[in-house]
Curated annotation (Swiss-Prot):
Protein name per UniProt: 3-hydroxyacyl-[acyl-carrier-protein] dehydratase FabZ
Gene: fabZ
Entries under Gene3D superfamilies matching the protein: Hotdog Thioesterase
Reactions performed catalytically: a (3R)-hydroxyacyl-[ACP] = a (2E)-enoyl-[ACP] + H2O
UniProt organism field: Picosynechococcus sp. (strain ATCC 27264 / PCC 7002 / PR-6) (Agmenellum quadruplicatum)
Keyword Chaperone carried by entry: no
Family that this chain belongs to: Belongs to the thioester dehydratase family. FabZ subfamily.
Major localisation: cytoplasm
Alphabetized GO MF terms: (3R)-hydroxyacyl-[acyl-carrier-protein] dehydratase activity
PANTHER family listed in its UniProt record: 3-HYDROXYACYL-[ACYL-CARRIER-PROTEIN] DEHYDRATASE
EC class (word): lyase
Length: 155
């Protein structure tokens, strides 16, 4: 990390490193890079939106728009990046337990870069976490809301 700005990384964390922490793979790997990271508190992720993504075939023909649920999922994956590195929660998988106060403010289309800032609100007993997220394109809010996560045990 650099000392210029708390959380600023000397080099962005690439998708190959993200995939060591998260189970998501194409077509549901929705974070291309982590740009900023403050352990246990906050991460900023980037998703490059390309026309080649499978959901654009049907959403919406001749006017491709990234589905809102995938914007929320992308923010959740940034949240998962934070959670899976917290002490005692390594090698864990956190699933959605709920979403609140989600709003979609502008469309996200091929060619955009969705910048997602996700911050931890609370973590309880290393099992339940609440976070707030905001996704922007060109400095404009595209999606925002709160996400609730629950730790799953696969045994």
């Amino acid at each position: 990390m650099t000392t210029e700005h708390p959380g600023t990384l000397a080099q962005p964390i690439p998708v190959e490193e993200i995939q060591k922490l998260l189970p998501h793979r194409y077509p549901f790997s929705l974070v291309d890079r982590i740009l900023e990271y403050i352990p246990g508190e906050k991460a900023v992720g980037l998703k490059n939106i390309t026309f080649n993504e499978p959901h654009f075939q049907g959403h919406i023909p001749n006017h491709p728009i990234m589905p809102g649920v995938l914007m929320v999922e992308a923010m959740a994956q940034v949240g998962g990046f934070i959670l899976t590195q917290m002490p005692g929660m390594e090698d864990s998988f956190f699933a959605f337990a709920g979403i609140d106060k989600v709003r979609f403010r502008r469309p996200v289309v091929p060619g955009d870069q969705l910048i997602m800032t996700v911050e931890v609100i609370t973590v309880k007993a290393k099992r339940i976490a609440k976070m707030k997220g905001c996704g922007t394109v060109d400095g404009q809010v595209a999606v925002e809301g709160e996400m609730l996560f629950s730790r799953l045990n696969f045994e």
